[in-house]
Amino acid sequence: MISSFGIRAAIALPLGAAVLAVAIACQPLASSNSSASDKIAFDLSSLDENGLYGPPDGKRSLDYEFCIPVGDAYAQAVGAIDPSVQLYPQSRGRIGCGEGEVLAIGNTNQADHDTVLIELANLDYIERIQPVDWE
């Protein structure tokens, strides 16, 4: 014969484990934006609502570069996120795109520039987005 303690223990242990599992599963995950913003090698807060930076009488947009894998699917995906992007398959850029990669250059002077940059940085195949160093 099973005691009432045995029955309660038999029910409580699995129930407790289930409650613990649900509690852990409901914890917020680290924001994907935090890892995405780590890929962006400049301070987004330095840009105004129009994607410009600098003194009031000398505002300018910021050009940025990153590498994407060769292929139409990658180019189309990036272009759908950032219409300012131009691809330069013959250049490595300062960022140093490797074999099998294409240099992409975009510009912050566009609507929702910060959202665009975060969405680009959220793509697994984009490792870094940095300012273009025009000489």
What does each of the following model-derived ranges do?
Residues 119-130:
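Short acidic amphipathic segments
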Residues 2-15:
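Bacterial N-terminal signal peptides that target proteins for export
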Residues 29-73, 131-135:
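Autoinhibitory N-terminal propeptides
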Residues 51-112:
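Mature extracytoplasmic domains of secretory-pathway proteins
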Residues 111-119:
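Low-complexity, intrinsically disordered Gly/Pro/Thr-rich segments
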